[in-house]
Amino acid sequence: TSNVYEEGSVQHIARIHVSLGVDQSSKKEYEAFTTLYSENIALIRNEIIQVIREQTYSMMSKADAQTKLGSEIVNRLNKLLDTELIKEVYFKDFFVQ
């Protein structure tokens, strides 16, 4: 859950729950990633919240919002963790009001 703003300082709420789709084709890389993920869960959560806070209500209300937001989260988390194993973001909950 995060605050989302619109021009004119109108405050909105975004409640979003995500799961990550990770490339599991290499068992060794996947196991290393799961360790990296566990060690950096706070940073990962913070990065996802930051991506959401950078969005406006108008951006989050568009039909392609989940696709664009998912791509941005994938890019930012892969950069944060110095990996390319995160391939997809799955939205369990996507509520903007």
Predicted feature residues:
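Amphipathic, coiled-coil-like alpha-helical scaffolding segments used for oligomerization/assembly
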Residues: E54-Q97
